[in-house]
Amino acid sequence: EKHEWARSIRDAAVTKAQPWLDMSDDSLWDLMMGPNIPRTWHVWSDGHCPSCKQDVRMYDWIADPWKHPWKLQCPKCAERFPKNDFEKFHRSGFDEHGVFQSDRADRSLLFNTGHPDPADPLHTFGVDDGDGYVADGHRWRFIGYYVIFGHWKKWVHAGIENLSAAYAVTGDARYAYKAAILLDRVGDLYPSFDFHTQGGWVYEITSGTRGQVSTWHDACEEVRAMAYAYDRIYDGAKAQEPALAAFLSRQAAAYKLTNTKATWADIQRNIESGIFEDTLAHRNRIESNYPRTDMTNLVINAVLRWPSNREAVLSDLDAIIEKSTAVDGMSGEKGLAGYSSIAPSALAEIMIQMVRLDPEFLKTVVDLRPSFHQAFRFNIDTRCMEEWYPRVGDTGAFGRKNSRYAGLSFTPDSAADGSPYSFFWKLYEVTNDPALVQVMYLSNEAKLDGLPHDLFGEDPEIFQSRVKEVIDREGTEINLGSVNKQNWCLAILRSGEGADRRALWIDYDSGGGHGHMDGMNIGYFSKGLDLVPDFGYPPVGYGGWT
């Protein structure tokens, strides 16, 4: 209650979780859907609205399950699709386990509710049975898209994350109880999801797609987030074994589930085997940009078995750090300030959690792997005049500035996730590199207020006074000379001071992950402008990319 910034973080977490807290246990349990609706990453990636005919591409369709469940809204004309009552149709197809089976559903419900007369020419307009609405040779997969971007992401998964965060910042056991209900129901059904065999449409094609509920890259992030959430609420949920077992065992009996949920051990087994062990057994479904998959598996193993598997987890983490920092502190993936930031941001995320377990862990890592420090120096050394990064590979757009540090995201409302500001300060204490403090300070709008935005960190007044000492001594401008990242093959020549600073860069290799084939690519920043702008992320050439 002492600090306004802390109250703000806590209150925001509570506000986000409130809608799920207000739901009945039965309604919460009902949120998780089965796998039998063909899922898709786009309604029609290069398509238009069937009503107003205006372009509605890629991810522009609006899903708001709280206000309009089982509907998408056109952002141009505000019409909602599908036009049939899919919620009623969906429920009519439930089997004895509470899972939708299309062959059991009442197809007499497949009509435009605004035009119920079969003789009306609009009687079937906009009607989707789960496999899309077809007209004039085109298919709009409204429900397949909604299931992921509405129901799963905004109802089920968001509920797990928000409830667990609220529990972490309040200690109120009601949040842990509600989160456990969601996690348990996900545990019932998660192993039955396989994006590749259940539609798996991405850009209107299915070949090569992988995933779980979502496609591979999001599936990887989603299951790791659920592991963090489960870890947060574990003790609070376990303490409510009688209430949880009473409700979940009743549901198990009513829906003829194999796990009776009679005890916390049953519930724990259902969550851990259904979500996390299943993920470990199907790595291909979450295979993503390095090191996201390895990191996800590490987090799952740590959550399930720490500290008994401490040595194995630390060995896996060391392997991740070694590979992620092998190329001048980076993984070697191109796309500077974009894809290349995946590795350092991943390292920061996992290290924030590990330092909570052992405050001396970061020093041990830097002593053993000095390249870990370079992972966060790289995006300092290659940033030009605090506004630009060289356009190397798939990144950015023509002439667009990079106003923020790209090595990780400085978010002031991290709530239960830990603070990147605290992490950078700890890294400074280990390395004595003042540029880390300067970046942290500038990322906080060049002010001390609110630092370190960490509900679980040290006294903020002491933290701020220490940051002030560094800034008073070093200033806010990071003094950088010319650099040559020989392994990453990027050189930057710098000259001038203040408003006359300028930088000439050359990328002297080609290809690589998210790299381009334009060897010896050059650029020049001066007078606040990119005077030799690269085109940035190239045209993809398919779907609705523009």
Region roles according to the model:
Residues W152, T215, I286, G332-A337, ...:
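Alpha-helix N-cap/helix-initiation motif
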Residues E311-S315:
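Short sequence/structural elements of tandem HEAT/ARM alpha-solenoid repeats
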Residues E1-A302, L317-D318, A348, T546:
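Extracellular glycan-targeting catalytic surfaces
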Residues I321-S331:
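Histidine-acidic residue clusters that define the catalytic metal-binding segment
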Residues K2-R7, D11-V14, D22, D26-W29, ...:
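Extended polysaccharide-engagement surfaces of secreted carbohydrate-active enzymes
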Residues D316-I320, P539:
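Active/binding-pocket-proximal capping segment
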Residues V303-P307:
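Flexible helix-coil junctions and inter-repeat linker/turn elements that act as hinges
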